[in-house]
């Protein structure tokens, strides 16, 4: 290892790399440690979606800030590859009046914070998504600013190119600001930030983070455009979109790693949703399966901030690390370097679990 850095960041996913970027922007020397390399974990398989439609104030604000960063990422990260953002929109469908009422509450909050989402009638959802069957649709929530990146990995690589990333497995985090390595020895620093996703509780066992599997099915590229916005049905636990290269992506959001379940069961659930909602996709084969892992907390909210004297954490994102990473990077960097405590840290701190201050995020996909 090289000379002693000011800060060690454990984890070279998009969250850890964003933290390293913002720390360096504030003049800190930073070493990023990861046992497998840049974007080798969940960041490497996430499909690149970004949205501002959330059900809690803190996530709406973080997502809004992150979207502004990503809009300028080409310049900020000195990118040589266009990540290819497509503002196709996210459409959330409601199939009951109670679900629609919750969507109205979410949209009211989002509008208050400057997010241009709106409630749609069933007929309006059908106009937005040609071919959508609305017999079971009570309404929807929509924002045209949401979308996805064709090449999300280019953003992760751009963050990584600006960081000092070293291959190394961390086996222990010391309260005094050091990490112990599997290869032997320690790396000393003034502060340590753990952004290791599902690996975080191995290093910080006091944190209630658990792994939860997610499964994405992909078709081969299709020339015909069959589905432009991303369509999510929380009640049917289903989501689908067509990517820029023509592949159709579909997810059975109820497939949570049940060892008794079979791939054919998950495909059957997706086929059932296609038949009821998107019949134009019924005959699209989905031969490719990608498995990812969410790092999940009891309230499906991230854990951010200081957890020990010289140790900070940014983990437990339930699949939205990519969506929030730029804002999280700024917040953690300000806390570590300047001692500034962003409002998000007061609601996403680790102490909320023991104190009963849980704030469930209802809009997890």
Where are the regions a protein language model picked out?
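N-terminal Rossmann-like FAD-binding beta1-loop-alpha1 element of flavoenzymes
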Residues: 7-31
């Amino acid at each position: 290892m090289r000379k002693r850095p000011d800060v060690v960041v454990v984890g070279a996913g998009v969250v850890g790399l964003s933290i390293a970027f913002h720390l360096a922007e504030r003049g800190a020397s930073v070493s990023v440690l990861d046992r497998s390399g840049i974007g080798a974990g969940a960041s490497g398989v996430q499909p690149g979606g970004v949205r501002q439609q959330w059900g809690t104030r803190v996530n709406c604000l973080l997502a809004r800030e992150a979207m502004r960063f990503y809009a300028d990422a080409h310049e900020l990260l000195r990118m040589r590859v266009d990540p290819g953002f497509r503002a196709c929109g996210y459409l959330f469908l409601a199939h009951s009046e109670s679900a629609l009422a919750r969507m109205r509450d979410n949209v009211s909050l989002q509008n208050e914070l400057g997010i241009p989402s709106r409630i749609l009638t069933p007929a309006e959802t059908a106009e937005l998504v040609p071919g959508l069957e609305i017999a079971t649709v009570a309404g929807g929530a929509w924002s045209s600013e949401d979308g996805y990146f064709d090449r999300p990995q280019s953003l992760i690589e751009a963050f990584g190119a600006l960081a000092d990333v070293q291959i190394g497995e961390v086996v222990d985090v010391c309260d005094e600001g050091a990490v112990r390595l599997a290869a032997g020895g320690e790396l000393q620093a003034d502060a340590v930030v753990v952004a290791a996703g599902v690996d975080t509780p191995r290093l910080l066992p006091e944190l209630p983070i658990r792994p939860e599997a997610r499964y994405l099915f992909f078709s081969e590229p299709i020339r015909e455009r069959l589905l432009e916005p991303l369509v999510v049905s929380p009640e049917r636990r289903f989501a689908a979109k067509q990517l820029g290269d023509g592949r159709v992506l579909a997810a059975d959001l109820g497939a949570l790693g049940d060892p008794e379940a079979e791939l054919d069961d998950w495909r059957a659930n997706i086929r059932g949703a296609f038949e009821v909602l998107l019949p134009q996709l019924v005959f699209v084969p989905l031969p490719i399966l990608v498995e990812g892992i969410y790092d999940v907390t009891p309230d499906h909210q991230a854990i951010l901030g200081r957890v020990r004297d010289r140790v900070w954490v940014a983990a437990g994102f339930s699949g939205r690390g990519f969506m929030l990473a730029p804002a999280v990077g700024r917040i953690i960097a300000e806390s570590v370097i300047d001692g500034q405590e962003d409002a998000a840290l007061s609601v996403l701190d680790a102490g909320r679990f023991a104190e009963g201050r849980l704030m469930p995020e209802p809009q997890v996909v």
